[in-house]
């Protein structure tokens, strides 16, 4: 069975690599040291410091595994290969809801880089899927849990 690929920009991959390095070179050694100190307290059956450190170690190892998988199966997209006014991964798009003055700005990224609080939406999200491939001036129907609405694409720029 083929592994899932993780679509992302080169910048997103580099960010994941930096995060992986942080886990391997900083967080993993810190938790190993905390486990060592907690063991020195003696009886492990009622040692909450030891249990907490072991739980954190399991979390860290899980994160390392997830990051390694995303990096290994990364599919890098080049937003420069797409027309300047076309919505794609690695682009920032400004849209205005038709019939209102409401404007929204979205940075379209691969799923691994999504962060809705900073306006970074996954290419797999309904909004991004509706916008990808469209150009400035296009009107696009967006399906959301709250209902359907239309937006006009006002601008598209490469995300820095």
Curated annotation (Swiss-Prot):
Disulfide bonds: none annotated. Residues 1-72 form a coiled coil. Keywords: Coiled coil, DNA-binding, Transcription, Transcription regulation. GO terms for molecular function: DNA binding; RNA polymerase binding. GO terms for biological process: DNA-templated transcription elongation; regulation of DNA-templated transcription elongation. The keyword Transcription regulation applies. Pfam families: GreA_GreB, GreA_GreB_N. Belongs to the GreA/GreB family. Necessary for efficient RNA polymerase transcription elongation past template-encoded arresting sites. The arresting sites in DNA have the property of trapping a certain fraction of elongating RNA polymerases that pass through, resulting in locked ternary complexes. Cleavage of the nascent transcript by cleavage factors such as GreA or GreB allows the resumption of elongation from the new 3'terminus. GreA releases sequences of 2 to 3 nucleotides. This is Transcription elongation factor GreA. The lineage of its organism: Bacteria, Bacillati, Bacillota, Bacilli, Lactobacillales. The gene is greA.
């Amino acid at each position: 069975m083929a592994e899932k690929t993780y679509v992302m920009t080169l910048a997103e991959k580099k960010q994941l690599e930096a995060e992986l390095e942080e886990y391997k070179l900083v967080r993993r050694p810190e938790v190993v040291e905390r486990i060592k100190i907690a063991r020195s307290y003696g009886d492990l059956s009622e040692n909450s410091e030891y249990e907490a450190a072991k739980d954190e170690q399991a979390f860290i190892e899980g994160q390392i595994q997830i990051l390694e998988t995303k990096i290994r199966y990364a599919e890098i997209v080049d937003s420069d290969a797409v027309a300047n006014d076309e919505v794609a991964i690695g682009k920032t798009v400004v849209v205005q809801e038709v019939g209102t003055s409401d404007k929204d700005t979205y940075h379209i990224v691969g799923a691994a880089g999504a962060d809705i609080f900073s306006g970074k939406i996954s290419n797999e999200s309904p909004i991004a899927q509706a916008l990808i491939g469209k150009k400035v001036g296009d009107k696009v129907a967006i399906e959301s849990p709250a209902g359907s609405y239309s937006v006009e694409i006002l601008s598209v720029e490469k995300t820095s």
